[in-house]
Amino acid sequence: LQQLGLQVDAFDLSPSNIEEANKLANDQLHFFVHDIREPLPKQEQYNVVFNFFTSFGYFDDPIDNARSFQTFAGGLKSQGTLVMDFLNPTYILANLIPEETVHQGGIDFHIKRWEEKGFLYKSITFEDQGQAYSFQEKVELISKEDFLRYAEAAGLHFMNLVGDYTLAKFDAQTSPRMIFFWGKP
């Protein structure tokens, strides 16, 4: 977006991620540490807010999801647009690969995936130079209906929903993604 001449602000909760991203910062591209559950430092400043690649759904309390939508809405100018990309839980669960080993760079990554209490978990274990590593991720399986409720409660109106990065029509059974477009009045 910045390469298209747009002014871009981006944030992440992780200081180390922002430290790495700041290597790319310039006059039109700024990075900062921020918790999406809190109001943005710049209110009503953005024509468009993007949330891509399932960078949502990591909170245990649904109130935090609602607070995040308030933050999105608060950052938008009037007539602004929120574009949010999230996994389609129906598709993901129907096509879940419970266990696999991926060989990359001379390392075998052992990956396990499972659903538990409304969350999708992924465990990754591997060994490198005699050292064992183990990581676990979890993301809430948020339904289309819940997203629509969060957005409506934040004062956003629904504009469109597509099912993948080619912007194909959304189908609950076959679309891998839910990419929402909401507007701020």
Listing of model-derived features with the role each one plays in the protein:
Residues 8, 82-83:
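A short hydrophobic/small-residue beta-strand
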Residues 37-49:
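A short acidic, Gly/Pro-enriched loop at the edge of an enzyme's catalytic core
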Residues 47-64:
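A short SAM/SAH-binding and catalytic strip from SAM-dependent methyltransferases
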Residues 64-81:
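A short glycine-rich, Lys/Arg-flanked "PGG" loop and its adjoining helix->strand segment in the class I
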Residues 83-150:
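SAM-dependent methyltransferase
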Residues 144-185:
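C-terminal lobe and adjacent flexible extensions of AdoMet/dcAdoMet transferase-like proteins
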